[in-house]
A protein has these predicted regions:
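Aromatic/hydrophobic beta-strand junction motif of beta-rich domains
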Residues: 29-38, 71
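Short beta-strand/loop motifs in extracellular/secreted proteins, especially
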Residues: 41-44
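Sec-dependent N-terminal signal peptides
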Residues: 5-12
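Non-cytosolic beta-sheet module surface loops
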Residues: 34-39, 49, 92-94
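Short, surface-exposed loop/turn motifs with a glycine/proline- and acidic-biased composition
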Residues: 60-95
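Surface-exposed loop/edge segments in extracytoplasmic proteins
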Residues: 53-59, 97-99
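C-terminal tail/sorting-segment detector
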Residues: 14-20, 26, 32, 83-108
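Short, glycine-anchored, charge-dense loop/turn motifs used at functional sites
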Residues: 48-55, 86
Length: 108
């Protein structure tokens, strides 16, 4: 019998930020999401309004390290969102890795 029992814990981490925040989609600005992850995986970006209505969804391949992708402030139906705060979530297919945050759109 082995005297030692080894426990390996693999931490699958996702760090995500976006900039500029706030941004003016009406003036043609986009916000850039910067996602840093420790392993490659296929992900999905979801953007919701504050009533939990899904406005935007995009499947994105993630590489280990830094990844960059943008959002122009338009829904999947190509409609400009109103000024306000929106929630974003980045998940893998099992929803076991989650990056999340808020993005503020100011349309003037």
């Amino acid at each position: 019998m082995n005297k030692y029992t080894w426990l390996f814990v693999f931490l699958l981490t996702v760090t995500i930020i976006n900039y500029p925040n706030p941004f003016n989609a009406k003036a043609g600005q986009t916000t850039t999401f910067e996602c840093t992850t420790d392993t490659a995986f296929n992900s999905t970006l979801y953007i919701y309004d504050m009533t939990a209505r899904l406005l935007f969804k995009r499947d994105l391949p993630m590489n280990a390290g830094a990844n960059h992708f943008g959002w122009n402030g338009y829904t999947e139906q190509n409609e400009l969102v109103n000024s306000g705060v929106y929630l974003y979530f980045l998940t893998d297919k099992n929803h076991s890795r989650v990056g999340k945050g808020k993005v503020w759109v100011i349309n003037r």
